[in-house]
Curated annotation (Swiss-Prot):
Task of the protein: Binds directly to 16S ribosomal RNA.
Signal sequence, start to end: none
GO terms (BP aspect): translation
GO CC entries: cytosol; small ribosomal subunit
PANTHER family, per database record: 30S RIBOSOMAL PROTEIN S20 (PTHR33398), SMALL RIBOSOMAL SUBUNIT PROTEIN BS20C (PTHR33398:SF1)
Similarity comment: family membership: Belongs to the bacterial ribosomal protein bS20 family.
Keywords, alphabetical: Ribonucleoprotein, Ribosomal protein, RNA-binding, rRNA-binding
Name of the protein in its database record: Small ribosomal subunit protein bS20
Length: 88
């Protein structure tokens, strides 16, 4: 356990940031999952909407420091590729 006052503050700060990051990661994963479900259902219009939301979520993840920019680019590329396959 932390002994100094500053170490105790840091533990609390880390806990808060961890919660915030978990929430943001969960929202990101949910957006991606919903897009993939729309792709599985072959609903092109719904997939288009869900793709846009997923891409925005990924970009927000980068700006919040949850994802590395290269990871985000890779995920966006893969999602776009899946969308292009169903739209032919």
């Amino acid at each position: 356990m932390a002994h100094s006052r500053s170490a105790k503050k840091r533990i609390e700060t880390i806990r808060k940031r961890t919660e915030r990051n978990k929430s943001a990661k969960s929202a990101l994963k949910t957006a991606i999952r919903r897009f993939e479900e729309a792709v599985q259902g072959d609903d092109k219009e719904q997939a288009r909407e869900k793709l846009q939301k997923a891409l925005v979520s990924i970009d927000k993840g980068v700006s919040k420091g949850i994802l590395h920019k290269n990871t985000a680019a890779r995920r966006k590329s893969r999602l776009t590729k899946k969308f292009n396959i169903i739209t032919g």
